[in-house]
Design a protein with these regions (language model features):
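N-terminal catalytic cores of secreted or lumenal carbohydrate-active enzymes
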Residues: 1-95, 99, 116-118, 122, ...
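General N-terminal targeting signals
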Residues: 63-65, 111, 159, 217
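Short, intrinsically disordered, charge-balanced linker/junction segments flanking boundaries
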Residues: 213-219
């Protein structure tokens, strides 16, 4: 996890992302990824999950909560393309993305940006998918949802409603939270049968300390 808020698109109003930069990642994150690649005997695939757009793209001008302004949908789609290109230039191939980490929100404890199933599907169908296709990056995997399993049905019903809505989705991402008391087998089966030829991937799992009680822990 990052120790601070930062964006690759820090310049407000840079809708063409002419100043897009991953320099912040070059000291620690990229060397860590390369070290892991060198240590792995079998190799692994990398996918990325944005937690929020830069505040200037959002309706609440904040790192936390709020929604992507509709006028910045094209810019945000370009962001994914630029990110993949920038990492490739560093010798790291990105396999794919989730569209948004925890699009239903996270209690405003961390960076976040809210999408409804309909909003995310519109973004993927009309902006992200066509942008990657136009840039020759159609092999990049796009995973929708990316939150807890209990809400799968509502999301996959929208994502995989028809051929048009599902065209650019390569699968569904899920988190393990809440699964300590129920692993939601019916929801998992429903999502699988809704789109049996698409990925259903566990995208995040961590044991996070209670917020803000972690500040009382001995470090």
């Amino acid at each position: 996890f990052s120790l601070s808020n930062y964006s690759y698109t820090a310049i407000e109003g840079d809708t063409e992302l002419e100043h897009f930069s991953i320099d912040f990642d070059k000291d620690d994150l990229i060397p860590m990824i390369k070290a892991a690649q060198e240590a792995s005997e079998d190799g692994f695939k990398l996918f990325a999950s944005p937690w929020t757009a830069a505040p200037w793209m959002k309706d609440n001008n904040s790192w936390v909560g709020g929604k992507l302004k509709p006028e910045h949908y094209s810019t945000w789609a370009l962001f994914f393309s630029k990110y993949a290109d920038a990492y490739k230039a560093e010798g790291i191939d990105i396999w794919g993305f989730t569209v948004e980490n925890e699009p239903m929100g996270n209690g405003n404890n961390w960076e976040s940006m809210v999408f409804s199933p309909e909003e995310m599907t519109l973004f993927v169908q009309k902006y992200l998918g066509p942008t990657l296709e136009a840039k020759g990056q159609e092999d990049l995997v796009i995973l929708g949802f990316d939150q807890n399993r209990g809400d799968l049905k509502e999301w996959v019903d929208v994502m995989y409603k028809d051929k048009a809505s599902s065209k650019y989705y390569d699968g569904t991402a899920i988190h393990w939270y809440e699964s300590t008391y129920d692993y939601f087998p019916k929801e998992l089966q429903y999502a699988h049968h809704k789109a049996p030829n698409k990925h259903l991937i566990q995208a995040e799992a961590c044991v996070d300390s209670e917020v803000p009680a972690w500040k009382d822990d001995a470090w």
